[in-house]
Amino acid sequence: MLSRSKAKRKAHFEKTRTLLTEKIRESMISVLPIIAIVAVLCLFLVPMQPTLLLTFLVGALMIVVGLGLFSLGAERSMTIIGSKIGTALTKIGKLPVILLVAFALGVAVTVAEPDLQVLAATVPNIDKTVLLAAVGVGVGFFMVVCMLRILYGINLRWVLVACYIAVFLLAAFTDRDFLGIAFDSGGVTTGPMTVPFILALGVGISHVRSDKRAEADSFGLVALCSIGPILSVLLLGFFSDGGGGAAEITQVSFDSTTGIGTAFLQALPVYMKEMAMAMLPIVAIFLVFQVFVFKMNTRSFGKIAVGILYTYVGLVLFLAGVNVGFSSLGAELGAALATGETEWLLIPLAALLGWFIISAEPAVAVLEKQIEEVSAGAIPGGAIKVSLSVAIALAMALAMLRVVTGISILWFLVPGYAIALGLSFFVPDIYTAIAFDSGGVASGPMTATFMLQFMMGVSIARGGNVLTDAFGIVAMVAMMPLLSIQAVGVIYQRKAQRAAQELESYGDCDIIELWEEAA
């Protein structure tokens, strides 16, 4: 009996190790293009201090391991918690309880989102806690909207149209310093912490309904929840002063490798405390449900607890790696390229980085498979990958163009969203839901970390306004799947219709010829 128990533990350990290795490999594939391009730039175009480059590499290693641990932990804890709470709420069946819990969960999960933590720490002149609270409340409110939409079967397309009309009306009157931050907030909230949790919760709630549209209506939650932060930060702009976007690059230098080690060791306790506070609400909600509703056995509870621990450790490593290693080199590299003879490289380099970042993003493979399944194989995954790569490269190039020229982000977002919403009338609802849900796929951790810092470095070196020029890159990237996925859907739908018409026409001719022969 003892040997059997030992064998089970060993098998579980091996399975966990295999999964962790796979998650770390996926993280490495995401980060590797950035490391390679930065290495080439530092070796041949803009030499950097060796200690700064070493700090960047150590930070990259921490990001890879941190993202791997976080992904495994979120899969083993947050996704399961979301699914169980969704199922439990359907059994309770009381609308006020469902809406209250949905709001609380929206706030709790959002404030622990790693990409949002990075963005909030990067924004100058705006208190981090205030920004996190505003974004959390925005997501919480729209979680309530999502639940109502699922329960009452309201068409996603019209909800999106109404919400984006409200967004751009507010954007027309708010402080322009808040535009980029607001739209970036919408992009970073649909990250690796929030998305699995929200999707699992939505699927659980959709089981309340038994009609054919229930499963399809479980899509679109991420799309709507990303609108909440945009509206809440735009509203924040009416009551807060952006401070003119003044910022400067903090010169980071280390005398030796000992100094590098000290910097990371000093950062770790800070992020341990921050993430403990950030994860406390979601852990508290889970414990309340465990005591009064779930009542899981010790083994099941232990698995989720270990998953939460993985998530916590992963977040701490990720944030320390980003803020100590990635950020400083990204900003200095951008500033160095923005001055002198290398200035012409900025836009093509941004496009190149965009192409490789999305090509290496593991979540894109999941998206490709999802669209292939929904289209019954009519839309090949390769078409989605190429369209996304081109779209994100274009988004990065346009974002850099904004930094260089100071063009308002609204000149890109208003027509972009107008076209995206227009396309939604020409594709099946499920394509629209998947496209709007997929903004977070494109705006992955590398966009919110390295690329934002890179753009900020360029803006500061050119004497620009960081808030109006550099911020908005995540929003530009997050908008592209809305356009590319729906556009591919329209193209393939037209092809299918033409093929069906040709087949029908061919069949008609066949029948006529047969009758003529018989005569």
Question: Residue spans of the language-model regions?
Answer:
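Juxtamembrane and boundary regions of transmembrane helices in multi-pass small-molecule transporters
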Residues: 1-5, 146-161, 177, 181, ...
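Flexible loop linkers connecting adjacent transmembrane helices
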Residues: 75-93, 118-124, 326-341, 363-379, ...
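Hydrophobic core segments of alpha-helical transmembrane domains in multi-pass membrane transport
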Residues: 30-45, 59-69, 101-108, 138-149, ...
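Intrinsically disordered, low-complexity non-transmembrane regions of multi-pass membrane transporters
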Residues: 1-27, 31, 82-96, 210-214, ...
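Structural signature of hydrophobic alpha-helical transmembrane segments
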Residues: 56-68, 125-137, 184-198, 250-251, ...
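Helix-loop-helix junctions within the multi-pass membrane cores of secondary transporters/permeases
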Residues: 87, 95-166, 343-424
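Transmembrane helix-loop junctions in multi-pass membrane proteins
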Residues: 40-54, 74-82, 108-123, 142-153, ...
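Transmembrane helical segments that form the transport core of multi-pass membrane transport proteins
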Residues: 53-58, 250-363
